[in-house]
Regions:
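N-terminal auxiliary segments of SAM/dcSAM-dependent transferases
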Residues: 1-69
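C-terminal substrate-binding/active-site "lid" region of AdoMet-derived donor-dependent transferases
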Residues: 2-3, 181-251
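Conserved SAM-binding loop and adjacent beta-strand
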Residues: 7-8, 77-92
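Conserved SAM/SAH-binding loop
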Residues: 87, 112-113
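Conserved class I S-adenosyl-L-methionine
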Residues: 101-112
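Conserved SAM-binding loop of SAM-dependent methyltransferases across substrates and taxa
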Residues: 113-124
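Conserved S-adenosyl-L-methionine
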Residues: 122-128, 193
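S-adenosyl-L-methionine
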Residues: 130-180
């Protein structure tokens, strides 16, 4: 009986991450008989195939590389891309904010290079993507298949989500679009009551526009956040924040789809009568 995927010795055809002495990272797919060419020399793929991950290997010049299987964050940062990707610090927050889990049906509009699709699929959901650009759609399909294989429950259609959503009874709708407020009508019709809408936007002006539109429709519990990531230098007695940090990348806005006919005065956004 073989090892589960992602365990055991490295095999022909899987992705690996090489890290050199300066912690530069290289993502490659192992191919028997091939070689990896770098400033540090040539490293034969055959010298990696069959090794345990966590091993140290040397190239033709004697310089060493640590070899590991890549994490999802490694793949997102190193994979081929056309559109700007959603960064790992935001991907984790999106999975929590949208409460993504196994068995859910998710619509993603604006798939870009497929980073968010990968994260949602890995969490066990199925994904239908709407993408207006064929080159982005093809890149997303390729990147997802490269990480998760061809059998994941993933379909990308070339279409404009503002023209309508065919799916109904969706659990989640994820939007990476410049004008997500134009999709609120179709999204409300596609989401089940209690479902979650999440939009990723680069500017606060766009976020404010979206929040205003949400306040006028069947949405409740709207919330907007920004995720900042700061690493620390920790070495012996030298402990301080790193000089550089991953600051603003985008704003995450979530809202719950309310029932079409909520009881008067019982919803979370229900107006409060002034005291007399």
């Amino acid at each position: 009986m073989g090892s589960p995927p992602g365990r055991g010795p490295l095999v022909d055809g899987e992705r690996v991450l090489l890290i050199d002495a300066k912690e530069r990272r290289y993502l490659l797919t192992l191919v028997a008989g091939a070689a990896f060419h770098t400033h540090a020399g040539i490293l034969a793929h055959d010298d990696l195939i069959g090794r345990e991950e966590g091993s140290t290997v040397s190239g033709s010049t004697g310089r060493s590389f640590l070899v590991l299987r890549p994490t999802l964050a490694d793949v997102v940062l190193k994979m081929p891309r056309g559109a700007q990707v959603i960064y790992p610090k935001d991907l984790g927050a999106i999975l929590m904010a949208a409460d993504i889990g196994p068995g859910q049906r998710v619509l993603e509009a604006g798939v870009g290079s497929g980073a968010l699709s990968m994260a949602v699929l890995r969490a066990g959901a199925s994904v239908v993507g709407y993408e207006v650009r064929e080159d982005f759609a093809n890149r997303a399909r390729s990147n997802v298949a490269g990480l998760l294989g061809p059998d994941v429950d993933y379909r990308v259609e070339r279409r404009d989500v503002t023209e309508g959503i065919d799916e109904v009874g969706l659990d989640r709708v994820l939007l990476d679009l410049p004008e997500p407020w134009r999709v609120l009508g179709p999204a409300a019709g596609a989401l089940r009551p209690g479902g979650i809408l999440l939009a990723y936007l680069p500017t606060i002006n766009q976020t404010a526009e979206l929040r205003g539109a949400l306040a006028e429709g069947p949405w409740g519990l709207a919330d907007s956040v920004e995720i900042l990531r700061r690493t620390w230098h920790v070495e012996a007695r030298s402990v301080r924040p790193d000089h550089r940090m991953v600051g603003h990348t985008g704003f995450l806005t979530t809202a719950r789809r309310l029932s079409a006919a909520p009881a008067s005065g019982t919803g979370p956004e229900a107006p409060v009568s002034p005291a007399r």
